Amino acid sequence: MKKIYGEKIKAVVFDWAGTTVDYGCFAPLNVFIEIFKRRGIDVTMEEARKPMGKLKIDHIREMCEMDRIKNIWSDKFGKVPTEDDVNELYAEFEPMLFETLEEYTTPIPHVVETIEKLRKNGLKIGSTTGYTREMMNIVEPNAAKKGYSPDFLVTPSEVSQGRPYPWMCYKNAEALGVSPMSSMVKVGDTISDVKEGVNAGMWSVAVIKGSSELGLTQEEVENMDKEELKAKMSIVSKKFKEAGAHFVIETMAELEDILIKIENETIKSDFVPENDYILLTPGPLSTTKSVRASMLKDWCTWDVEYNNLVQDVRRRLVSLATQNTDKYTSVLMQGSGTFSVEAIIGSTISKDGKLLVIANGAYGKRMKDICNYLNIQFVDCTFKDIEAVDLNVVENLLKENKDITHISMVHCETTTGRLNPIQEVGKLAKEYNKIYIVDAMSSFGGIEIDVEDFNIDFLVSSSNKCIQGVPGFGFIIANKEELSKCKGIAKSLSLDVYAQWDTMEKNNGKWRFTSPTHVVRAFYQALLELEEEGSVEKRYARYKENQFTIASRLKSLGFDTLVNDNAQSPVITTFLYPKNAKFEFMEFYTYLKDNGFVIYPGKLTDIDTFRIGSIGEVYPTDMERLADVIEKFINR
């Protein structure tokens, strides 16, 4: 039999109730309603279904936190539900569910035959659930008798956290022997299912008929007026897409077509040409083939699918930036990173404001240029390019210039590769009640930053740096309260951050002017790949190892580094020309390029240097190969 999929996609992980068995996911529903009813609280079907897919005790806990239920509980018992109440409810829930669970193990239509086809194409079948292992000890064998049995099952009680966390999916990948996560598909029927798959870096497919989200019996679906059913399904589909589902299907019979589509999307990357060289620069940088392949499709800026993707990107950026996601928002701005730096300075500092510009490199100094162009008052706090920021000097300027309203500085100054003390300056900003702007262009996504912990009001970065997208837009992580005060301040039509934010909020991700659609789609793919790598912590570790590898190898060849190790970033390293050797940079550059590597010239005017970046789709083995090429150049 010729495979029509299964070359790129290796496994499908299914949910249980509402996806593969128990049409409509009714087994736990009535029990959730009953345990509250026993306490004189009538919960609605919608309330009982909303947390579906989660570990059942977490489901009960979330119901207890719903405003209406919590208020009724408080009126009846004189207090809001406590953790003891949650445990008591669960203690009743579990035995009641056990009594009826066996009745809800019949496979949903099209499941058994679809999975048989998947296996014939060589796919492995995994599963996750919101049930405990004890519950699944009833469901799993009974479903097997009726024709459905996956290759692997993991329950929330066997990992540190259930949905929407990705840990159960990771367990499936390990048990099934499948990697990367992008070669796996998650299929489910709840919002938490969708998020589980997305958070795991998998393709996420949501099914409507039989789902908990639709909440109808098979008989109701078959007998309902077609237009009424269509309207209900449309609402469910929208919820799934807003949660991040890549595809939404009506029934499991459509899954094969989706797998073929995913396979073809993945195969596109096979037709993306290899790069002629590795970019060892601080951005633009080397990207994955899958990021480049994601730009092969055209997108309409008005289309809801594209705008939903924009909203998803915005949410993911805020989640990368802070744990307090309610306090911050993100705004995407067309253009290079400097466009966004100019936009935030011009959109937040009024004619009566004054900016303290802390600079020890070209990109800090560029902020002064922006102020001069925009006629913004500023206090100059410039250090030499090879100097560290002196916090005493910064604080003295704050004391001497009480009319300063804002502070700005660069986190990773790629002029030298130095990391600046943004957290310490953030403490000063808070102490002196100043608005704090950080240019984290070459660090965000590659070095852990929590904007709330660092007291950052506005953080600026761009698509083509540590998140490993391509050039085309910048973005601002903004304190909502401070951004809301900025209406009418902007000194530019197209660089008005407040207006861009307002439009994106009111129009579900729409940009004010034409957006770089292909770049946004590539950035979304890059975000998924960052999550798949293990988020910022793991990417930082890789970048750090890259930097250490090339720095240590080149030091052994006579190339000293400019910045001390304690201030050296993992982003880019500035090397001094070797002593006692004839060294001509363009000859060196050309030799490296001919051998598959592109580096940066130095940016200092009074010291002979060159720079090597360590970010992007680059690994320590690449740095070892680069060092070997440099050694051959030196020893010619």
UniProtKB/Swiss-Prot annotation:
UniProt-annotated stretches for the region Phosphonoacetaldehyde hydrolase: 1-276
Keyword Cell division: no
Transmembrane segments: none
EC number(s) stated in the UniProt entry for this protein: 3.11.1.1, 2.6.1.37
Record text on cofactor binding: Binds 1 Mg(2+) ion per subunit.
Positions that bind Mg(2+): 15, 17, 189
Region spans: 2-aminoethylphosphonate--pyruvate transaminase: 277-636
GO molecular function, one term: magnesium ion binding
Active site residues according to the UniProt entry: 15 (nucleophile), 56 (schiff-base intermediate with substrate)
InterPro entries per UniProt: Aminotrans_V_dom, HAD-like_sf, HAD-SF_hydro_IA, HAD_sf, NH2EtPonate_pyrv_transaminase, PGP-like_dom2, Phosphonoacetald_hydro, PyrdxlP-dep_Trfase
Top-level taxon in the UniProt lineage: Bacteria
Catalytic activity annotation: (2-aminoethyl)phosphonate + pyruvate = phosphonoacetaldehyde + L-alanine; phosphonoacetaldehyde + H2O = acetaldehyde + phosphate + H(+)
Required cofactor names: Mg(2+); pyridoxal 5'-phosphate
GO biological process, one term: organic phosphonate catabolic process
Keyword tags: Aminotransferase, Hydrolase, Magnesium, Metal-binding, Multifunctional enzyme, Pyridoxal phosphate, Pyruvate, Schiff base, Transferase
Listed SUPFAM superfamilies: HAD-like (SSF56784), PLP-dependent transferases (SSF53383)
Entry-annotated residues carrying N6-(pyridoxal phosphate)lysine: 465
Subunit-level organization: Homodimer.
Family statement drawn from the similarity comment of this UniProt entry: In the N-terminal section; belongs to the HAD-like hydrolase superfamily. PhnX family.
Known function: Involved in phosphonate degradation.
HAMAP family: PhnW_aminotrans_5, PhnX
Name of the protein in its database record: Bifunctional phosphonoacetaldehyde hydrolase/aminoethylphosphonate transaminase
Organism of this sequence: Clostridioides difficile (strain 630) (Peptoclostridium difficile)
